[in-house]
Amino acid sequence: MASPAAGDVLIVGSGLVGRSWAMLFASGGFRVKLYDIEPRQITGALENIRKEMKSLQQSGSLKGSLSAEEQLSLISSCTNLAEAVEGVVHIQECVPENLDLKRKIFAQLDSIVDDRVVLSSSSSCLLPSKLFTGLAHVKQCIVAHPVNPPYYIPLVELVPHPETSPATVDRTHALMRKIGQSPVRVLKEIDGFVLNRLQYAIISEAWRLVEEGIVSPSDLDLVMSDGLGMRYAFIGPLETMHLNAEGMLSYCDRYSEGMKRVLKSFGSIPEFSGATVEKVNQAMCKKVPADPEHLAARREWRDECLKRLAKLKRQMQPQ
């Protein structure tokens, strides 16, 4: 068995995101401590991780060079936070998206960690200035926002507090790369970070197009899944522009006036209520009934698709 990577990693919270982070860090050879205040929660989490890793190994989708058993041997549980922080180089907070709860956790960590550990939050929308301001170790704090499901979607948004040191950002970026993720540096905090701002822009226009009777809900989704989404799985919108003409300058010269004309026709922010909600809900429930069994099955299918796509992207040589 290969030697563990230098330093331990602590995961605070053993839900879906916490389990995913534990698997990712173990795949990179790190010893992982999984902390939760509820022992039964940790027991269930470890069993879930074991089943998932065995399944991934059988399908050839397990990350890292270690076997499932070797990775599992790197993951341990703990219920004492003061003991859990001993020897760790990185702490990844994964508790529910509640500002008061997260601030409480970071206040506890702030009082027991040294000056070397990185304090990282998995928050999807809470600004670092709300989470970390006032902490003694604020220079060591950063948001590392994963995308659900983190094991199959490698993007991680790194969002620093205004007082976060450049060294903390660099260390976290290098760590994410080491465990096979694709970190991006959000240079300054902004509500929604980058991914959700792009996602909400798409959702907003999609909603307006359905609301105004331009396209049906099912066809709207098809535009993304069988159109834009196929390109965006491999190249982003800016490179798409670059390739759709003789470079970026050519694209802007050719198409900027048309883009501005269309953009001026965009409407106001939708209310996401009323008749359109019923229309969209009816279309979605026709495709996937909104009961636990059907939703779980569809999520499983989605994750299988993402698993295969991730495998394909790993196999393809980046240009």
UniProtKB/Swiss-Prot annotation:
In the record, the effect of residue 124 to A is given as: Reduces enzyme activity 500-fold
Q: List the GO terms this entry assigns under cellular component, sorted alphabetically.
A: cytosol
N-acetylalanine modification, residue list: 2
Q: What is its EC number?
A: 1.1.1.45
User: Modified residue Phosphoserine is at which positions?
Assistant: 3, 111
Which Cys residues form disulphide pairs?
Answer: none
Q: In which tissues is it expressed?
A: Detected in eye lens, kidney, liver, heart, lung, brain and testis.
- Biological process GO terms, please? fatty acid metabolic process
What is the name of the protein in this document?
Answer: Lambda-crystallin
- What organism, scientifically named, is this protein from? Oryctolagus cuniculus (Rabbit)
Q: What is the lineage of its organism?
A: Eukaryota, Metazoa, Chordata, Craniata, Vertebrata
Q: Which gene encodes it?
A: CRYL1
